[in-house]
Amino acid sequence: MSASKASTADRERAQAQEQPARQEREQATQRDSGQPEFKNGEKPAQARWFGEAADDVLTIFERSRPGRRAFVAPPLGVPDRSLDDLLPSRLRRSAPPRLPEVSEPELVRHYNRLSKRNFDLDTGFYPLGSCTMKHNPKLHERVAALDGHARLHPLQDPRRAQGALELMWQLQQALAEIAGLPYVSLQPSAGSHGELAGVLLTRAYHEDRGQRRTKVLTPDNAHGTNPATVIMAGCEVVKVGTDEQGNVDLDSLRSKASDEVACLMLANPSTVGLFESGIEEIAKIVHGVGATLYYDGANLNAIMGICRPGDMGFDIVHFNLHKSFTQPHGGGGPGAGPIAVSERIEPYLPRPVVIRRPPEADGAEPEYDLDYDRPKSIGRLRGFHGNYGVFVRSYAYIRSLGASGLREVAETAVLNANYLLARLRHHGIAEHLPAAYDRICMHEFVLSGSPMKRELKIKTLDLAKRLLDHGVHPPTVYFPLIVDEALLVEPTETETKETLDRFADALAEILREAREDPEIARGAPYTTPVRRLDEAGAARRPVVRQPC
């Protein structure tokens, strides 16, 4: 076989082997598109995109037909060479890879259809609790795409990358001011990465003092990444309880605090959207046993410009630039989780750190550099210096708004959440979806679907699925775990009153339907290409790749 010619025999055999699986999936799709019978005889419409055919849920592999091509390379101006001459048999596959064979129009249409099915912030309301899915200004994309930013190589000599280093240094200063702590590292590339950095810094700090502290305290409403981070750092998770008002239970904290504790990981506002009213006492208890206080910055959007974690007594703070500072997120990144620390933690920051040297002469410019001379550092956290494009967008956001603008962001986020919560309470929705905590919330709030499940016979999952038919991305469901049938709603500051009203109306309509016929919600969604997945089957028989 020559390298320039593709054999179709193996592909045809592969297609024949794949045909039964394809037919089974097509039949399953047809079965899935069937709708339940409802008591009132009416069925919600099964929507289909204009121009969409019945087989549009097929994967690109299932569209494959032997011999089809999207592109055919022209003949080369060199003689054909046998594959045997080019590669020894030990480096060759035993059969050609079973890659999809489709025409160019099929390829374009397939991915174009998929792109239109994406739901994102540019499509509609996205109140995913604890994720801060707010509008990301498009101007920042243009700034990040400038050649001086987008084409800069990470190995560029610092002397020829002064503009980029200056931006990073300026961002460090801005984040330090927002956190109320003097030193910042931009290296961590995600929130959980920032958490890991924080726990490693805490461990290094205690070890440098000759102390082996292996326990890390986390409240029972903490993000799931908190205990996972603790385990990754080689420490032990110790849970601290919360009281009926959603605050850290101070008696529980006192009983767990000891000289074995390295730190307490805490979000403020907490994961249930409430401000920790006892934060000063919490800091006193933690510092009283020689431990550090770590700030999970997942909910910083609610307080930035109003109060600062460092002023509350926190020693280490991580930021989610992809949440509070408008880096687009979802789908796996990129993100950024910089950390700010107090003076006693500074020696252990990851290396290198961006520094500014004063001008050597009057009228000269300051010089920016990367400082590797950090003997107590925990080392590098990644190959280069962080996700630079994220830094550009976040810096543009901070400079665009200024201090007063950032404060207005936080105030509006809290206002929107409390308006929406009040609207739910005063329009009968709270009867079946009450707030988990009867107090003023911050940027988000938790509802409990227990009364709805008990009285209307639909679960929080059913409600979330039915919201898809109303063109709304569902809030976070079944988290935090301490609230039964939880629904965590975060409207963010960039949504209008009309959008919040439409969301409340959608909830009211779903509850009205459930009173008359709960089967409607149980069968939802009806307007998506794929309905409910077989979660048990997916767990027992996962298909994680197409065979090649």
Regions found by a protein language model. Give the residues of each.
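General small-molecule cofactor/ligand-binding pocket signal
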Residues: 185, 238-240, 475
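A short, small-residue-rich loop immediately preceding and capping a beta-strand
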Residues: 182-188, 214-218
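Short, well-ordered loop/turn and helix-capping segments at boundaries between secondary-structure elements
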Residues: 204, 208, 232, 259, ...
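Conserved phosphate/anionic-ligand binding catalytic regions in large, soluble enzymes, centered on
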Residues: 119-140, 187-198, 325-340, 344-345, ...
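Conserved PLP-enzyme active-site core in the AAT-like
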Residues: 162-163, 193-367, 372, 376, ...
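Short glycine-centered, acidic/aromatic-flanked micro-motifs in structured strand/loop junctions
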Residues: 188, 242, 266-269, 447-449, ...
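Non-catalytic terminal extensions of PLP-dependent enzymes
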Residues: 1-183, 307, 357-381, 398-548
